[in-house]
């Protein structure tokens, strides 16, 4: 991946984050305690913005701190809340001798403030907003008398175990759901009501700062007990960096894991918080800037990137439209889709092509589908699929071809796909091919077809495959369990062997390709469960086809000036932006129809509004460039 695209947000694994952290401290000279303080401030602000309603008075807060630097972040956060007048309990872990140097220092600071908070000016006694000056909309204290420092308690492992004693109940997820709404009390010897009116064993907020991203083995012993206990508390829950028990590498649950309502991660997205099941444990996800920047990678950028739901997608999503343009200026798509009597997939994919900005569409489908195609999609041209279909002529006409939605796996479908790939390899100008659905199944079952695909990519041709997990398992000739246990590694192996751009569709869709021998990937953050419906993949193949055609036109205008690596990267960007747009369409459709009632056509219905918003963003970016230059616009 060339340089640093400021539209993108990097995804790091534990080692990449460790390297960035180390370079920030050692090379740039940023003190570790400064980074920790910024992390605590960022976490505090994110929590206040998430739950302003619970901070209208004195709040009871629990911070579970480990003995490493994640625990140090937690101790610093505990201090900030304590000095704001809240009652804070810090549950520390292990022996002090095993604390990291930063954690030890943070605990020393915290204890000194705890010992010295009496006798100071009661700056909040008038009930004013204790966070005034931080730009935070937090309710005032409603006249409640709160001293400048709240109550601070530090609990060791032994003290915590003594308080939970033999009455600690560890609930399963099902049991916890069954008891939802009940006030779970596990500190059984502290059930008396405190002067704030809350049970002394209950907390308004619990913060997980036990492990962070360094965890690589299963959680056991007292840590497992702590996480289970934390999960049973009834208040709000926040995690620092990543929920404890979630692998930062692959999102797997290492024995057990903290279930957060909000996760504030520092510097960059952690891979494990974007992949399932880890993503489910994070709740709302936020990245906080604490001073570790992309410059800290020293030119060795991470392999992973993402776009969050607030990112701009205008750069390569839309092709600028000149007033004197014509319909051929914005990409011509050839769609081989549908089988006899089953035109649904072809209609969905075809309409998605046109709604995504392509100038022209030609559909090749069996004769039985002709009447409904012409009636339902009159804007498209139609060609009857037959033994003698002139694929060479059709391929010469288009800028991109989509193969697969609903074509079946019969002899004619397989022969047609073979002819397409053969003709594509013989053409002077290679064109992008999008393979979906039955096109993928045919490729998985035919050595001849898979060989043609490899030959085409070897000569510089672009093939974008869009399998869901079952289709990907067939392509890899492995079982689902084997695929899911090492999803990224399996995807990497496949793209290295085949040379394709691979879109692994799932709840967290991953797009990957090989860049000069290095596996690069994108993890998508848009979309919702309502998109798990028939035809959603056909819509994606249509969006992908339209955007591939637009990219082909854009690259063709450069008259071959782009090198092969740059071309492949351009289509990687095309693929992940199509996935991003597809997910955004799903999110917008869910706002109108709800996730339960959504159907694939709702995604298409959302595209005009979304692309209109992109056009507005592009105009705004153009004005900014005119007045201020390219600063801050990425590419």
Predicted features by range, described:
Residues 2-104, 128, 203, 262, ...:
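Small-residue (G/A/S/T)-rich helix-start motifs and N-terminal tracts that mark the onset
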């Amino acid at each position: 991946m060339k340089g640093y695209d400021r539209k993108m947000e990097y995804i790091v694994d534990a080692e990449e984050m460790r390297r960035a952290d180390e370079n920030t401290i050692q090379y740039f000279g940023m003190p570790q305690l400064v980074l920790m303080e910024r992390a605590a401030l960022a976490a505090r602000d994110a929590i206040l913005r998430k739950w302003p309603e619970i901070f209208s008075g004195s709040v009871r807060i629990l911070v579970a701190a480990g003995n490493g630097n994640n625990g140090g972040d937690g101790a610093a956060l505990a201090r900030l809340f304590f000095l704001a007048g809240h009652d804070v309990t810090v549950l520390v872990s292990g022996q002090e001798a095993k604390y990291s140097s930063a954690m030890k220092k943070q605990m020393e600071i915290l204890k000194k403030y705890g010992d010295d908070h009496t006798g100071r000016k009661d700056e909040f006694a008038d009930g004013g907003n204790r966070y005034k000056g931080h730009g935070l909309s937090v309710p005032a204290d409603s006249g409640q008398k709160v001293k400048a420092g709240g109550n601070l308690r530090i609990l060791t492992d032994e003290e915590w175990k003594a308080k939970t004693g033999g009455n600690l109940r560890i609930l399963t997820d099902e049991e916890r759901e069954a008891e939802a709404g009940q006030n779970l009390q596990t500190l059984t010897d502290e059930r008396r009501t405190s002067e704030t009116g809350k049970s002394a064993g209950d907390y308004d907020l619990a913060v997980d700062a036990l492990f962070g991203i360094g965890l690589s083995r299963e959680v056991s012993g007292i840590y497992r007990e702590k996480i289970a206990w934390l999960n049973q508390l009834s208040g709000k829950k926040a995690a620092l960096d990543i929920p404890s028990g979630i692998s930062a590498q692959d999102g797997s649950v290492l024995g057990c894991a903290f279930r957060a309502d909000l996760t504030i991660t520092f510097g960059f997205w952690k891979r494990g918080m974007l992949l399932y099941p880890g993503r489910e444990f994070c709740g709302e996800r936020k990245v906080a800037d604490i001073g570790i920047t992309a410059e800290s990678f020293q030119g060795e950028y991470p392999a992973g990137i993402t776009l969050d739901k607030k990112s701009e997608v205008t750069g390569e999503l839309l092709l600028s439209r000149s007033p004197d343009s014509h319909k051929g200026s914005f990409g011509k798509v050839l769609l081989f889709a549908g089988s006899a009597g089953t035109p649904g997939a072809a209609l969905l994919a075809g309409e998605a092509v046109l709604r995504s900005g392509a100038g022209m569409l030609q559909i090749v489908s069996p004769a039985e589908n002709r009447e409904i195609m012409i009636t339902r999609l009159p804007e498209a041209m139609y060609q009857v699929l037959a033994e003698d279909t002139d694929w060479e002529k059709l391929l010469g006409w288009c800028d991109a071809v989509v193969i697969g939605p609903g074509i079946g796996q019969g002899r004619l479908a397989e022969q047609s796909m073979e002819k397409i790939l053969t003709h594509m390899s013989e053409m002077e100008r290679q064109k992008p091919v999008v393979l979906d659905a039955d096109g993928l199944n045919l490729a998985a079952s035919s050595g001849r077809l898979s060989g043609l695909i490899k030959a085409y990519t070897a000569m510089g041709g672009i093939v974008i495959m869009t399998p869901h997990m079952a289709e990907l398992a067939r392509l890899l000739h492995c079982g689902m369990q084997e695929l899911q246990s090492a999803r990224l590694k399996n995807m990497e192996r496949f793209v290295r062997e085949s040379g394709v751009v691979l879109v692994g569709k799932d709840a967290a869709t991953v797009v990957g390709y090989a860049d000069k021998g290095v596996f690069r990937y994108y993890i998508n953050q848009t979309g919702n469960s309502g998109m798990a419906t028939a035809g959603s993949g056909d819509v994606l193949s249509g969006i992908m086809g339209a955007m591939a055609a637009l990219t082909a036109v854009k690259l063709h205008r450069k008259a071959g000036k782009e090198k092969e690596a740059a071309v492949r990267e351009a289509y990687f960007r095309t693929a992940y932006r199509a996935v991003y747009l597809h997910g955004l369409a799903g999110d917008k459709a869910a706002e109108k129809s709800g996730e339960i009632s959504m159907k694939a056509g709702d995604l298409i219905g959302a595209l005009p509004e979304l692309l209109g918003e992109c056009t507005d963003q592009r105009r705004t970016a153009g004005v900014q460039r005119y007045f201020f230059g390219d600063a801050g616009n990425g590419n």
